[in-house]
Amino acid sequence: MLKKFFLPDEFVKNIFHITPEKLKERNVKGIITDLDNTLVEWDRPNATPRLIEWFEEMKEHGIKVTIVSNNNERRVKLFSEPLGIPFIYKARKPMGKAFNRAVRNMELKKEDCVVIGDQLLTDVLGGNRNGYHTILVVPVASSDGFITRFNRQVERRILSALKRKGHIQWEE
């Protein structure tokens, strides 16, 4: 059960290790990505210049991006709108509705999309439960909001169990 729900298909150090070339090899046409601690620190209001370049590179290669966040409308809108990136706020991840809505909005199929995030309990669990290819990234910041701090404690236990069972091939 742990493996089925909590083991991501891929693990990368950060979003910048996900390139259009690698995505094209998998025939990926769409990205559903978390915002806080995946793209930028949870308390950073705007995208970094490097992240803006990453978004532009995806767009140039025809890869659509939608931000799906459990955060509130104000936070997600203030970050996403200046970039012209579609978004879904209060997504209620790991529930699947927001993931599926993002795919419909991008006019793609589930098989054409990946889910990227920094949390096992929201991003990976939600993506895996709903049949998406999942990519776990190391959190951008070492600090978290209150609820996420609790989730991280649970995640450490899950990762430890997956590692003991030989399912994890990377170093944390």
UniProtKB/Swiss-Prot annotation:
GO CC term, one of those recorded: cytoplasm
Molecular-function GO terms, alphabetical: phosphatase activity; phosphatidylglycerophosphatase activity
Function: Has low dephosphorylation activity on GMP and glucose-6-phosphate.
Superkingdom: Bacteria
Descriptive protein name: Probable phosphatase YqeG
NCBIfam families cross-referenced by the UniProt entry: HAD-SF-IA-v1, HAD-SF-IIIA, YqeG_hyp_ppase
Upper lineage: Bacteria, Bacillati, Bacillota, Bacilli, Bacillales
EC number of the protein: 3.1.3.-
Phenotype when the gene is knocked out: Required for growth on solid medium.
Keywords recorded for this protein, A-Z: Hydrolase
Pfam families (UniProt xref): Hydrolase_3, Hydrolase_like
